[in-house]
Amino acid sequence: KTINCNKILTEVYEHPNYSDFQKYLINEQFVLAQKNREYNCEIQKIDLKPYQSLIKKLGLAGIQFFESKNDIKNKSDHYRKLEKLEWSIDQDIPIPKGIKWTRDSFDRFLEKKKFFEQKCYGTEIIAVKDGKYIGMTSLTVFKRSEPNKAFTETLGVLKNYRRQGIATALKIKAIETLIIKGIKEIRTDNEINNPMYKINEKLGFYPVPSSLEYLKTID
C-alpha cells in the first residue's frame, strides 16, 4: 500500500544509550524539531490532602470529575463529546513545525478508544460542567511490560475554562485513581516551552533525560 507521506519523525533521549542513534540521525540529515521535558513521579509519596480544597471549590462552581470508563461511558453521547474535546485539546499541544494534526473519522476514534479501554487503560478523567466536557487527562498502563507505571497521553482544558486549577485537579483525580489501582509511578512530558511542566514540579515530579524529536523531509 502506498502512503502519501513526505516526512519522517522519530525520537531519542538525551542519554548515553541513545548517542549513536542520535549521531546516525544527524548524519542522515534529520533536524532537531522539538525538545520535551520528561518527568517521573512516585505517586504514592505525594501528599494529596492540600488539593482537596481545590477540588471542593471547583465542585461548588459546578465542575465535576468522572472516570470515563467506569462512570460515564454508557451515556449515549459520551464518545461524541469525548472526541470533540480531544480534538479541541490537541490543537493546543505543541508539535514540531511542519507536522499537522489529522482528525480521525469518528469510527476510527471509537476503534482506538475501545482498544485503549480494553488493552492499556490506566485511567481517563473528564471534567464536566453543565453537561459539557471541558477538560480531560488520559493515562496508559502497559500491563505486561510495566504494570506499575502509568504514562500520560494527554492533559488539557478548553481555553474558556483555564486558570481555575482544573488541570491540577484532573491530575490529582487521576493520581488518586491510579493509587487505588496499585500504580506506583507516572511518566509525563511537556514541550520545552510549555508552562504545564510547572504543575508537575509542584506535585513532586522530578526531571529525567529529555526527549528530542528529529524530523526529515523526504522526496
Regions found by a protein language model. Give the residues of each.
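Acyl-donor-binding surface of acyltransferase catalytic domains
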Residues: K1-K75, L212-K216
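Active-site/acyl-donor-binding loops of N-acyltransferases
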Residues: E28-L48, T123-I125, E176, K181-D219
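A conserved beta-strand-loop-helix scaffold within acyl/acetyltransferase catalytic domains
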Residues: D90-K149, E153-V157
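Conserved hydrophobic beta-strand within the GNAT/NAT acetyltransferase core sheet
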Residues: I8-V12, T152, I186-N190
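Short amphipathic alpha-helix that is part of the acyltransferase structural core
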Residues: L54-S105
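Conserved G/P- and acidic residue-centered "switch" motifs that form tight phosphate/ATP-binding loops
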Residues: G131, G165, G182
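Conserved acetyl-CoA-binding loop-helix of GNAT-fold acetyltransferases
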Residues: K1-T2, K23, V157, R163-E176, ...
